[in-house]
C-alpha cells in the first residue's frame, strides 16, 4: 500500500506557492502521491501542476470528478438527455486527462440523487449505460474509472459495497473497477470490515476519511483494523487521506493524519 492525500483543485488556491507548500508539507510528512479534486479538465493547468509534482517527485494517483454535481447539476441518472450527454462528455474528458497522467478517475457523486430521478430502477439503468459508454472509451485510452459507493444522503444509487460490486461486475469492463471510502462504509455497512471479502480482484483505490470528516483519529473509524483487513485481502494500491470538515489548517491536518496512520501501524507494500 501507498499513501496519498487529497488536495482541492489548484485553481482554488490563491497562488501557486500555496499549492506547492501543501505538496512540500505532504512530502516531508511521508506521503507518496497526491489526489486532486478537479472541476473541469479543460481548465486544469497540466504543465504547471506537473512542474509542482516534479519538485517533490510525486505521482498523481487519482482525479476526483464529482464537484460539478453541485455547481452545474451534472449527473447520469436524470431523464434529461442533455444533462446526461454533458456529463458523459465531461467524464470522457476526465478519461483523457487520466490517460495523460497514467492515473485513475474516481466516479460516484455524478450518479445523482433520487431528487434527480425518483425511479431507482430507471436511474440505475441510465447510469449503467452511461458508464458502459465511458468505460469502453476508457479501454481505448488505457485509463481506469474507479466506481465509488457513496452514502444514501449524498447519492441515490449503488450506496453499498455489495451494490457497487454488482454494478462493476455486471459491466465486465477492465476499465471499470471498484474503490471504497471509509466515511461511506461507516454509514452504509452493517459490519464495517467484513465487506472487503471477495473484492480483491476489483478493488483499485481506497479513500481514508474519518467518520466525522475531520483528521484521522478524531472520529471512531477503526483505522488499525482496517489496515489489517486490507493486508489480508492483498490490497497494494493507494490509500488517499481526505479531510473535509475541520478547523485545523491544512498543514496541521496533513501532519496529524500521518501521525495517526503511523500509530495505527500503516505499512507500505
Residue ranges and their predicted role:
Residues 48-57, 127-137, 195, 225-229:
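Catalytic-core regions built around general acid/base machinery
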Residues 1-9, 13-30, 158-180, 184-269:
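Histidine-acidic metal/acid-base catalytic patches
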Amino acid at each position: 500500500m501507498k499513501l496519498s492525500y487529497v488536495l482541492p483543485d489548484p485553481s482554488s488556491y490563491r497562488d501557486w506557492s500555496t499549492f506547492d507548500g501543501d505538496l512540500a508539507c505532504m512530502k516531508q510528512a511521508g506521503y507518496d502521491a497526491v489526489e486532486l479534486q478537479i472541476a473541469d479538465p479543460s481548465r486544469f493547468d497540466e504543465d504547471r501542476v506537473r512542474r509542482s509534482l516534479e519538485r517533490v517527485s510525486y505521482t498523481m494517483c487519482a482525479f476526483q470528478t464529482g464537484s460539478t454535481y453541485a455547481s452545474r447539476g451534472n449527473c447520469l441518472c436524470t431523464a434529461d438527455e442533455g444533462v446526461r450527454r454533458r456529463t458523459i462528455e465531461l467524464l470522457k474528458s476526465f478519461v483523457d486527462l487520466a490517460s495523460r497522467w497514467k492515473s485513475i478517475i474516481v466516479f460516484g457523486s455524478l450518479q445523482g440523487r433520487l431528487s434527480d430521478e425518483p425511479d431507482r430502477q430507471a436511474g440505475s439503468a441510465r447510469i449503467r449505460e452511461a458508464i458502459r459508454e465511458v468505460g469502453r472509451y476508457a479501454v481505448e485510452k488505457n485509463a481506469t474509472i474507479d466506481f465509488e459507493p457513496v452514502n444514501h444522503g449524498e447519492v441515490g444509487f449503488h450506496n453499498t459495497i455489495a451494490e457497487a460490486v454488482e454494478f462493476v461486475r455486471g459491466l465486465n469492463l477492465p476499465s471499470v473497477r471498484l474503490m471504497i471510502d471509509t466515511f461511506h462504509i461507516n454509514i452504509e455497512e452493517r459490519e464495517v470490515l467484513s465487506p472487503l471479502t471477495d473484492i480483491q480482484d476489483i478493488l483499485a483505490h481506497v479513500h481514508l476519511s474519518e467518520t466525522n470528516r475531520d483528521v484521522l483519529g478524531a472520529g471512531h473509524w477503526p483505522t488499525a483494523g482496517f489496515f489489517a483487513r486490507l493486508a489480508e485481502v492483498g490490497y497494494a494500491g493507494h490509500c488517499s487521506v481526505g479531510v473535509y470538515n475541520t478547523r485545523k489548517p491544512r498543514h496541521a491536518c496533513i501532519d496529524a493524519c500521518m501521525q495517526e496512520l503511523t500509530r495505527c501501524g500503516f505499512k507500505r507494500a
